[in-house]
A protein has these predicted regions:
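Bacterial N-terminal signal peptides
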Residues: 13-25
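Short loop/turn segments immediately following the C-termini of beta-strands
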Residues: 51-53, 102-104, 160, 170, ...
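Short loop/turn segments immediately following beta-strands, especially the blade-tip
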Residues: 65-71, 121-128, 168-176, 226-234, ...
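Asp-box/WD-like beta-propeller blade repeats and closely related beta-sheet repeat scaffolds
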Residues: 129-202
Length: 405
């Protein structure tokens, strides 16, 4: 969950950036991609969660105006005072925002053992102001990830510290209701310092919403659950999990645009594992492991975030320690990754980043150097370039966009 001290595997993907750009530009999918922003708004509210303990001067969730035509960030201010909001998520209508709370001063080895919480807020579409609705117990330690299902009626939550996954009902007014389902992970893996027990790190629904995938950093597995979309319940699938290479430490999970392939970001291995996905069975089959860092990198790194762009042609992964974002081209037929670029984030520990809804910009949160930076996205090649837009903010750790009225 936090920035660890494990040396990564350092095998480099054996393709040059130039070759990847040429292949990407020649692909039929690249030619058919719609122009970024063609069906999106131009003005957004951007909410940023921050750590609030230790030396941080931040106090919770901050809001900004984001101009998708220029990439300019305009600070609005503190939107919600809340302790250590480790992750943010919105409902499908963008009327409500949800935030987990880690307990204060519990970062580091052996932390996250006491229950945290999850809070709900109503979003003012004109001003971006947040109105607190309610807060409930997370039923586990160190909550680190939340997801609202497409109906807006169920919230899924992963507890990193105690290694569990939970679902909650969402009431019509956006507030969080009763706990619906719960599953406690068990097991460990090869790194006794960081994998002494289960550490659920995300909860992601399949494109058809029938399955829930939960990468567990502590057990080197991705747990797979069947979901009852009407009731909001989940139960172990058959197969109930896929096992990763020992020590990779799976952190985050995403699907490709067409849903045929899945990508798991491995924190401890600084890598992305590519899977083919059987939508009928909910099963995953490994087809590639791509390592994010140059072969000559000798330092410590822990990869943090992963996202596929809206065209489905590129995948982005952030690396804490190497302090970079790795850009891959996605083969539309095979789902495999080819290196395009590895670009410095111009700061320390890029814990989180987000592609804006138009796909024209990436906003990066450098946690330790305390800043938000905007990068331009080359629509043809997927490459990133800093725009020069920078905003200071202590310990930014999660970024979400909401259309402004």
């Amino acid at each position: 969950m936090g920035y660890g001290n494990r040396r990564p595997l350092r095998t480099w993907v054996a393709f040059t950036a130039f070759f990847a750009m040429v292949v990407s530009a020649m692909s039929p999918q690249a030619e058919a991609a719609p122009p970024a922003g063609s069906a999106a708004a131009s003005s957004y509210f951007m909410y940023v969660a921050t750590y609030t303990d230790g030396k941080s001067k931040s106090k919770g969730i901050y809001s900004y105006r984001f101009d998708a035509k220029t990439g300019k960030l305009t600070p609005i201010g503190l939107a919600a005072e809340i302790v250590n909001p480790g992750w943010l998520s919105t409902d499908p209508t963008h009327r409500f925002l949800y935030a987990v709370t880690e307990r204060p001063n519990e970062r580091g080895p052996g932390a996250y053992t006491k229950d945290g919480s999850v809070s709900s807020y109503a979003i003012d579409p004109k001003t971006g102001a947040l109105t607190f609705l309610n807060k409930v117990n997370s039923h586990g330690g160190g909550p680190c990830y939340i997801l609202v299902d497409p109906t807006g009626k169920t919230l899924f939550l992963a507890n990193y510290g105690t290694g569990s996954v939970v679902s909650f009902a969402i009431k019509p007014d956006g507030s969080i209701g009763e706990r619906i389902s719960f599953d406690q992970h068990s097991g460990s893996s090869v790194d006794h310092a960081r994998q002494e027990g289960p550490h659920a790190h995300a909860a992601v629904l399949s494109p058809d919403h029938r399955f829930l995938f939960v990468p567990d950093l502590g057990t080197d597995q991705v747990k797979i659950y069947k979901v009852d979309a009407v009731k909001g319940t989940f139960s172990p699938n058959d197969p109930a999990y896929v096992t990763m290479k020992p020590g990779l430490g799976p952190r985050h999970f995403t699907f490709g645009k067409d849903g045929r392939f899945a990508y798991v970001l491995c924190e401890m291995g600084s890598s992305v594992v590519v899977f083919s996905y059987d939508a009928a069975k909910g099963s995953l089959t490994t087809i590639q492991t791509a390592y994010n860092l140059p072969a000559d990198f000798k330092g410590i790194d822990n990869s943090a975030e992963i996202e596929v762009d809206r065209s489905g042609r590129f995948l982005y992964a952030s690396n804490r320690g190497h302090d970079s974002i790795t850009v891959y081209a996605i083969d539309p037929a095979k789902g495999t990754l080819t290196l395009v670029q590895n670009i410095p984030t111009q700061g320390s520990i890029p814990r989180n980043f987000a592609l804006d809804p138009t796909g024209k910009y990436v906003v990066v949160g450098n946690q330790i150097s305390n800043e938000l930076l905007v990068f331009d996205v080359n629509q043809k090649y997927g490459t990133l370039k800093p725009t020069g837009e920078k905003v200071d903010l202590d310990e930014p750790i999660c970024i979400v966009f909401v259309p402004a009225a």
